[in-house]
Amino acid sequence: MFSWLGNDDRRKKDPEVFQTVSDGLKKLYKTKLLPLEEYYRFHEFHSPALEDADFDNKPMVLLVGQYSTGKTTFIRYLLEQDFPGMRIGPEPTTDSFIAVMQGDVEGIIPGNALVVDPKKPFRKLNAFGNAFLNRFVCAQLPNAVLESISVIDTPGILSGEKQRISRGYDFAAVLEWFAERVDRIILLFDAHKLDISDEFSEVIKALKNHEDKMRVVLNKADQIETQQLMRVYGALMWSLGKIVNTPEVIRVYIGSFWSHPLLIPDNRKLFEAEEQDLFRDIQSLPRNAALRKLNDLIKRARLAKVHAYIISSLKKEMPSVFGKDTKKKELVNNLAEIYGRIEREHQISPGDFPNLKRMQDQLQAQDFSKFQPLKSKLLEVVDDMLAHDIAQLMVLVRQEETQRPVQMVKGGAFEGTLQGPFGHGYGEGAGEGIDDAEWVVARDKPMYDEIFYTLSPVDGKITGANAKKEMVRSKLPNSVLGKIWKLADIDKDGMLDDEEFALANHLIKVKLEGHELPSELPAHLLPPSKRKVSE
């Protein structure tokens, strides 16, 4: 009789089936989250509605910093070529937002044309008006790096009130719009003249909901000596600790990101290691792009739910006829109490609420009579999406990761550090002697042989027990020594001959010098007598 009730129930329990993560995100947003956003005017308070291009676009990297910290030079270093509209100098040069993207031919697309292109994820930027669009361009060029990622260059942040007023648009709001949609935010600081102006502090605070995307680069570190670099690094961490309100330590990369010779090469190895870490982080973006979009949708859904509770609470408190203006002022002033009540009634985390001061400012300009009462059905749909459909998409994300080839950023500066003698760590640690004709272990073998013959070899081999007595003198943990034993015991007979023993000691030396052990023994470390056997 009431079969339609059962059908509705079943529909609720069974999550939707999607072909790809991107299609799933689009469908969930349009059918389940967007109706809630529109009903409670979410877009007027927080963020414009998402479009298909927001789900389809490549990973984006946003560069933010004060003027002359090396933002544009950093992009030039990554791409290993100039891009249209690029200007570099010690004075404030970049006066526009430049989206550096892949294109078949080099050229510049002006802002007004860019925001009407449905294939680009910038259509909603038209809300910032002509003052901004005249300062926004897209630089297109064919480049291998840009096949995997896009980079957003921003105007340098200046000190003083004039730069804030004379821009003609809300600079912090534009940055926040980009921060919501990019995969990585890189804050650049100049090690040679470390300074965090009030404007820069405000910008960092505006990005506070996106700390998980933030990385810090202390650039131009080759201009100062080691002792000064330590002081500058300490000062930077102290300053950031006051601005970024997070208990976790933000990751700071130290280096000199340009293609000129290092001015002070004392810390060359440090810079190389830091550059590799940063490059690995950027290279992982295409692989994690779907997960990032999923994470951002969840974050947006949680904010939309809280916003719905706030708006419906304000509607409920408003009188129907008299004293509306007085009540409106009272409600805005007591918004903190409303936050507290919603938090208790609906068990919502305080971190999910929008900024109190900003919300109060926005509410002053709103007509409360146009607000809508609580509509439980809309909220239930979003709750159902978070509980069931998102879990389904998480499974799909993992499936796509395993089925597709590993996606990495290639070309430009990423290419020069992967292989060959200038690859990171080439010829060091277990890689030492990779290009030598002679077996690298042979250099120290006479010393190892002296120890070997004191360990009572039988038929030219020592037992595992005797080898252990000598190997534990290194004070390395048993787990590490066990791995060294597996690598050195090439014929797997549970004993070591003189060459295998020398190899084990060589690997111990590699580990004690701070290098990682290989998972498999490299060909150049194979003892000469064992090479024919392995072949």
From Swiss-Prot:
Residues joined by cross-link Glycyl lysine isopeptide (Lys-Gly) (interchain with G-Cter in SUMO): 315, 511
* Annotated segments matching region G5 motif: 243
Q: Which GO terms describe its molecular function?
A: ATP binding; calcium ion binding; GTP binding; lipid binding
Q: Which residues carry this modification: Phosphoserine?
A: 349, 456
Q: Where is this protein primarily located?
A: membrane
Chain spans, region G2 motif: 91-92
Q: Where is the Dynamin-type G domain?
A: 55-286
Keyword set, alphabetical order: Acetylation, ATP-binding, Calcium, Cell membrane, Cell projection, Cilium, Cilium biogenesis/degradation, Coiled coil, Cytoplasmic vesicle, Endosome, Isopeptide bond, Lipid-binding, Membrane, Metal-binding, Nucleotide-binding, Phosphoprotein, Protein transport, Transport, Ubl conjugation
Q: What is known of its domains?
A: The EH domain interacts with Asn-Pro-Phe (NPF) motifs of target proteins.
The entry's family comment says: Belongs to the TRAFAC class dynamin-like GTPase superfamily. Dynamin/Fzo/YdjA family. EHD subfamily.
- Quaternary data: Homooligomer. Heterooligomer with EHD1. Heterooligomer with EHD2 and EHD4; ATP-binding is required for heterooligomerization. Interacts with PACSIN1. Interacts with PACSIN2. Interacts (via EH domain) with MICALL1. Interacts (via EH domain) with RAB11FIP2. Interacts with ANK2. Interacts with CACNA1GG and CACNA1H.
| Official protein name in the record | EH domain-containing protein 3
State the species of origin: Mus musculus (Mouse)
